[in-house]
Amino acid sequence: RLRGAGGGANLLLYAPIDTHLEGDESDTPWVGPKVTADLLPEAKMVDDWVFGLGSSNPKAMVATLAEVFRCVREANVPLLGDLSLGFADGGMPVTIPDRGHAGMSHGILHLLNRGGSPDFCIVMKPWNWVYHEEPGMAWFKLTVWGSLGYAGVPRGTPGFRSSIVPAARVILALENWLPAYTERNTSGVVRPDGWISALRSGWPERPAFPSAATEIFFDVRVNPRTSPAEVHAQVDDFLRGLLADDPELEMEWEMYGSTPGGSTPESNWIVQSARRAWEQVEGRPYPETPDLLGGQTDGSLLRALGVPTVRMGWPWPAEGAPEEVAEGLGGMGATYIPDLMPCAEKILWAVIDTCTRPRAEMLR
C-alpha cells in the first residue's frame, strides 16, 4: 500500500493470480491434441512476445498493475488517498475440493475480510473496454438414470435401461435451450451465455458394463439483475418440462456452485474516471455500448459486496503470434507486450485522477 497525505480515497488495483489449467499431464487430452507453448508452465520470450501458461491471463495483468504502482511511487505523485495493490488466488472459475474448495473468488473474499476493503477498485482483465458490471455464474450437475447393464444382454430386455442414450437427448435439448436463456436474460452490458462443459459415465476399463448413471455438467452465467436462485428456477422449469414430455426419462439435478453478478452504477466516480482515461488514451469518445460481456471475474463479487469496481483491459487475444498456440481458449499464454501499454496508461490516468483529490469530492 502506498499511503497518501490523507483525506483521499483508497483505490485498489487488483488482478487474480491463478491459472485455469494445471500445466501438467492432467490437462491432456482435454486442452487439445498437442501441447503448445501457451500451455506450458515455462516462460519463453520471442521479441516482444511472452509465452507460457497464463502469461496473458493472469500474469500480464499482475505485471502491468505492479508497474503502474511502481511508476506512481517513483514519480512521487502527490497522493491524498492510498493506492493499494492486491492479488489473490481463486479468481479462475474452478473449484478444487482437495485444496479446501479453492476457487469461486475465495481469495478476494479473504483479502476484503482482512483489512483490504477499499473505496474503489480497478480490476484488470482482457478486452479493451471499461465494464461497470460483470456476470456471475451458476454450475449445475444433471444425472440421467438407467440401470447397470451388460454388453451381452439384448436390447429391450426387461430391467435394462441405458443412461447414456437418453442423456444424449437431454444434451441436445439443453443445447437448444441455452441460447434462448441467453437472449431472455441479456441486459445492460452483460450477455449471460451457458455451455455444457463435462460428461461422466461408466468405467473406461469396464466397457462391457454400461453405467446406470450419466452425469452432465454445465455452466450458466448470471446477469447482475438476476440472482443465482432465479437462474436455478429457470433451469428447473426447463428440466421439469423435459420430464413431462418424456415420462420414461429419469433424472435429477442440482446447482452445486454459484456466484452472483455485480454492477456498479455508471454514474459512480470510478466508472466515469476510467471512461475519461479510456477516451484520453484512445483519442475518441467512449462508445455507448461496448462488446457485451459473458466472462466472470472477482469483480463480480467485489461489486456484490459493495465495492464500486470497474474492469479495464487491452485487446485480447493477441494476434500474429510467432509461435504456434492452441486453438480456442488454450492456455491464455501468449502476450504481446506493446498491447499492454495503452491499458497501463489508462489505469495510471485513473489512479492519478482518483487518488489526488479529496475523498468527499468523489463520494457525493
Language-model features: locations:
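Active-site beta-strand termini and strand-to-loop segments that position acidic
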Residues: 1-5, 304-305
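Active-site metal-coordination/substrate-binding segment of hydrolases
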Residues: 8-84
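Residues at beta-strand starts and edge strands
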Residues: 9-11, 81, 136-138, 212-216, ...
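Short beta-strand segments
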Residues: 14-16, 86-87, 122-125, 143, ...
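Catalytic metal-binding/acid-base residues of hydrolase active sites
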Residues: 18-20, 127, 200
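Charged, glycine/proline-rich intrinsically disordered loops and linkers
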Residues: 23-48, 94-112, 319-331
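Acidic/histidine-rich catalytic neighborhood of metal-dependent amide-processing enzymes
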Residues: 49-52, 56-139
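Metal-dependent amide/peptide-bond hydrolase catalytic core
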Residues: 141, 145-364
